[in-house]
Amino acid sequence: MSHLDNGFRSLTLQRFPATDDVNPLQAWEAADEYLLQQLDDTEIRGPVLILNDAFGALSCALAEHKPYSIGDSYISELATRENLRLNGIDESSVKFLDSTADYPQQPGVVLIKVPKTLALLEQQLRALRKVVTSDTRIIAGAKARDIHTSTLELFEKVLGPTTTTLAWKKARLINCTFNEPPLADAPQTVSWKLEGTDWTIHNHANVFSRTGLDIGARFFMQHLPENLEGEIVDLGCGNGVIGLTLLDKNPQAKVVFVDESPMAVASSRLNVETNMPEALDRSEFMINNALSGVEPFRFNAVLCNPPFHQQHALTDNVAWEMFHHARRCLKINGELYIVANRHLDYFHKLKKIFGNCTTIATNNKFVVLKAVKLGRRR
């Protein structure tokens, strides 16, 4: 846990999933402090919109103003809810919207934590363009190193005149005034042909590797299991290309597409609808934090390309949680398959959780591993 003192309220915050690390990563950053310093209670009129509030620092600080928390991360919503509870704040103080929803009209203040992907930022700025006014105060923040010329140009292109502040604690802010510059329409998704198939893969703004098949997934697809039955999970499904291939290779199986990103799950659904509509009755789509709340001993196999970062921080916390959830939800003799960068040494992590691990394939960058649930020891 970490403490954030600001002009609105003193907060105790923790990351989600919580960890027992000796030196845990902090649940807020200097950009959060810097953004809050710009505001005064007396100037906040109209709806408050907060975008990409990773662990709820801004939402908790401004809870008395009933803010809208907008983003593409279910884990961020869970983190915000947990931190509201931790600080004794009514959860209903914050309203949660995903990025593709309609934003509230005529907001008084918009606070944006600049996301990692420029495509997500553009989608969000275009959505804001429909609701902000020239009187809306628009402030964005990030680490100084993460604000580039392309970031500023995007604000200028979509919303209007843009300036930056001096750096403070290695954070920088962007101030923008809306004046409705001319702007051409943009497609909601980016699409590309998947080589070796007749499929067209559609990707919403925040999907990983949205402009082409990433090399890890490409390697994984060469070693996917075939002729499985029962229920299979594509965990952290992204655009669903792995699950789509599983549907094709395992005609007797049902595939459950799971991701914490609403845009990822929407992309997966769209890709099944457009490429294998006949398999929709063998498909399920779930926005979730890994397999939280899913009954144990349900699945025959889980396949996963786990992330090794959360927001801008390198961490294996999310992957570790995915592995534990997979083991709990697998049937006896059910199998977990993962692809990962070789340097992450997931072999020993899986062996610790499952008691076994087998290397299926390896190259100079990636490894495909399999672990089997042999009993109820955990």
Curated annotation (Swiss-Prot):
GO terms for cellular component: cytoplasm. Keywords: Cytoplasm, Methyltransferase, rRNA processing, S-adenosyl-L-methionine, Transferase. It comes from the Bacteria. GO terms for molecular function: 23S rRNA (guanine(1835)-N(2))-methyltransferase activity; nucleic acid binding. The keyword S-adenosyl-L-methionine applies. The keyword Cytoplasm applies. Pfam families: MTS. Its EC number is 2.1.1.174. It is an enzyme of class 2 (transferase). It catalyses: guanosine(1835) in 23S rRNA + S-adenosyl-L-methionine = N(2)-methylguanosine(1835) in 23S rRNA + S-adenosyl-L-homocysteine + H(+). Gene3D superfamilies: Vaccinia Virus protein VP39 (3.40.50.150). Its main location: cytoplasm. It is found in: Cytoplasm. Belongs to the methyltransferase superfamily. RlmG family. PANTHER family: RIBOSOMAL RNA LARGE SUBUNIT METHYLTRANSFERASE G (PTHR47816:SF5), RIBOSOMAL RNA SMALL SUBUNIT METHYLTRANSFERASE C (PTHR47816). Specifically methylates the guanine in position 1835 (m2G1835) of 23S rRNA. This is Ribosomal RNA large subunit methyltransferase G. It comes from Shigella sonnei (strain Ss046). The gene is rlmG.
